[in-house]
Structure formats: C-alpha cells, structure tokens
C-alpha cells in the first residue's frame, strides 16, 4: 500500500468493464480505462473498495441476506442437522465460537461451502476437503438461491480480475492462462449475534488468503473494519446494492507485491443480529502461486530484493482450515 486511506473507501462503478468483459480489446475503451485506473489506485492505496454497476440486482442481493437471516433464526437443533465436521470436508454449519482467528474464538456462526470436486482429483491434499456442500431444508429453495448467487459471484469476480490484470499492465486474461483454468471458490454465510457490550470480536483481524473477496453485508449495521497504515481501524459503512471487494494473499503474490492484502476484522456493536455473505474467488486448487513473469519484469520486487515464496494454493487452504478449526479437529 503506497498511501494512507482516505476518509472513505473508493466507490467504483464497473459497468463499463461489465459491458466489455469478453472483448479482447477492452483496454482501448475509454470507460474501461477509467475503471482500470480506479481499480489500480484502490488496490494500491487500500486493498478495499466498493463495487457498484456490477449487474446483480439489489433485490437479489438483499434476498440472499434475508433468507440467510431466516436460517440463523432456526432452533439450534435444526441448524445442527448440517453440522460441520472434518469427515464432511469442513462443509456445513459451525456454531458460535468454533471458528478461531489468531487462536481466539470468533463470535459468529456460519455455513461454510466450497467448490465441490471429484474424489481423488486433488490427491492427498484435497482428500480432507472432499464431500458435498450441506444445505438446510429450511428455508425452502435456499440451496437454489445460493447456487445461483455463486454463479453470479464467479462471473463478477472474473470480470473484476480482468480489470485488475489490465491495471497491472498485463492482458485482460493474464491470470486466466495458468492459474484460473478451474478456479476454486469459497462461500461463508456468516451470522453475528447482537451484543450488549462494546468491542466483542465477531471475527478477529486477518487477511484473506485467496485472490478476491466479495462481501454482501446488511445495509443497516456497520461492523466490518479495515486497518489503515497508521494502525487505525476504519469502518466500512454499508452502501445498499454494492459489494465490498478486497484483494487477498494470492493476488499479492501473483502481482509481485504491487498490491497488498489488508488486515480487516468484524466487530458488531449493534444489539441486532447481522448477516454477511462472503464469496472468495481463488486460483485453481492445485495452482503453484508465485509472481507471474510479466509482473516480475514490470515490478521487480518493487525496487527491493523481496522475493515471494512459491505457494501451492490447496496446501495453503487446507493448513488454514485445520488451524481455524483446531478445536473441531482435536475433538473429531
């Protein structure tokens, strides 16, 4: 990150990028060029930005949250019917306090979903994540709604990443040649109970470890916070109909450190329950992630001797999961 945060995170209308998303010559379009410039500044300065003009209706985005609220309102015993276990590939419902960040319990519950893959496809590393996503019977049609939402988020993430690739000086498809022939994804449907005291950590400070994250948060509660260069926590105030987008550790590596993944956390000081749906767009599960050649040439360690180690995404993910759900592993 090159500069400090502004008073508000940037709001970027990506509609020109969406219109031209499949045009190999999109970089020549003036509207796309403007969007690309804004993406570049946002990724360098903050690592976080709002996305509007994305083409997904506000009503649909809201319905995803409304039906998620309905699930979390169910009796605990009902939610446990899709309980997360290591045997289920870490897919399903997790109770409040099961998730650990930096070794401390987080005050949230969730449904965790991952891209499904065939048994044996990713060898021993992928074996611990094999299994089908667990969906509740109630609310009805929730599975169908969320599967459609996943498809839309995949398309949106791909479009944003094409703009970022242009911002870094590559072709729109720079990342897609090797790293995204079969992109992995994660979705976390998160519920944060209302609290009667301040500064209860809903989710501890962390960076995301994939490429891009799309955050769909309740419109009427401010809980997500991003840390600036001075060490201050900046509230990410909800904007109806928008997504909050941030870059993750894998994009930091691929870009040769030009873009920095940013620490963020969740503190729900509201007495009301909060829902947030996080979609995480990743590389191929078996991708060996290191700075792409074009970015090593254009940004050789940002003028330093910094070298980013090669990381196999799936190994990185499994290690993070087993650390996050340490209690689950120990008592399984």
UniProtKB/Swiss-Prot annotation:
Disruption phenotype: Plants missing 2ODDC23.1, 2ODDC23.2 and 2ODDC23.3 produce reduced guanidine content. Binds 1 Fe(2+) ion per subunit. Its cofactor is Fe(2+). GO terms for cellular component: cytosol. It comes from the Eukaryota. It is found in: Cytoplasm, Cytosol. InterPro entries: DIOX_N (IPR026992), IPNS-like_FE2OG_OXY (IPR044861), IPNS-like_sf (IPR027443), Iron_ascorbate_oxido_reductase (IPR050231), Oxoglu/Fe-dep_dioxygenase_dom (IPR005123). Gene3D superfamilies: B-lactam Antibiotic, Isopenicillin N Synthase, Chain. It catalyses: L-homoarginine + 2-oxoglutarate + O2 = 6-hydroxy-L-homoarginine + succinate + CO2. GO terms for molecular function: 2-oxoglutarate-dependent dioxygenase activity; metal ion binding. Fe cation binds at residues 206, 208, 264. Residues 182-282 form the Fe2OG dioxygenase domain. Belongs to the iron/ascorbate-dependent oxidoreductase family. 2-oxoglutarate-dependent dioxygenase catalyzing homoarginine 6-hydroxylation thus producing 6-hydroxy-L-homoarginine. Guanidine (Gd) is in turn synthesized by the spontaneous conversion of 6-hydroxy-L-homoarginine to (S)-2-amino-6-oxohexanoate (RHEA:79843); guanidine is a nitrogen-rich compound that can serve as a defense or signaling substance. This is Homoarginine-6-hydroxylase 2-ODD-C23.3. It comes from Arabidopsis thaliana (Mouse-ear cress). The lineage of its organism: Eukaryota, Viridiplantae, Streptophyta, Embryophyta, Tracheophyta. The gene is 2ODDC23.3.
């Amino acid at each position: 990150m090159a500069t400090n945060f502004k008073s508000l995170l940037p709001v970027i209308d990506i509609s020109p990028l969406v219109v031209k998303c499949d045009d190999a010559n999109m970089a020549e379009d003036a509207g796309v060029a403007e969007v690309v410039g804004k993406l570049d500044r946002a990724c360098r300065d903050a690592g976080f930005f709002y996305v509007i003009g994305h083409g997904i209706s506000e009503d649909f985005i809201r319905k995803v949250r409304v039906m998620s609220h309905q699930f979390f309102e169910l009796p605990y015993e009902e939610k446990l019917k899709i309980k997360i276990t290591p045997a289920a590939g870490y897919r399903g419902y997790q109770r409040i306090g099961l998730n650990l960040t930096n070794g401390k319990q987080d005050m949230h519950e969730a449904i965790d979903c991952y891209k499904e893959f065939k048994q044996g496809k990713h060898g021993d590393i992928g074996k611990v994540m094999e299994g089908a996503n667990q969906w509740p019977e109630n609310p009805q049609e929730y599975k169908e709604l969320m599967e459609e939402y996943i498809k839309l988020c995949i398309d949106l993430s791909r479009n944003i990443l094409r703009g970022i690739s242009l911002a870094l000086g590559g072709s729109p498809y720079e990342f897609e040649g090797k790293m995204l022939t079969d992109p992995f994804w994660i979705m976390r449907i998160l519920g944060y109970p209302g609290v009667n005291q301040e500064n209860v950590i809903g989710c501890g400070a962390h960076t995301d470890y994939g490429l891009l994250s799309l955050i769909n948060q309740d419109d009427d509660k401010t809980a997500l916070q991003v840390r600036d260069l001075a060490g201050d926590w900046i509230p990410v105030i909800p904007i109806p109909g928008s997504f909050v987008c941030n870059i993750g550790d894998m994009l930091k590596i691929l870009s040769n450190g030009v873009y920095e993944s940013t620490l963020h956390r969740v503190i729900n000081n509201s007495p009301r329950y909060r829902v947030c749906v996080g979609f995480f767009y990743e590389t191929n599960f078996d991708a060996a992630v290191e700075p792409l050649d074009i970015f090593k040439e254009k940004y050789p360690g940002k003028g330093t001797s910094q070298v980013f180690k090669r990381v196999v995404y799936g190994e990185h993910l499994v290690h993070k999961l087993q650390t996050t759900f340490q209690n689950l592993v120990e008592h399984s």
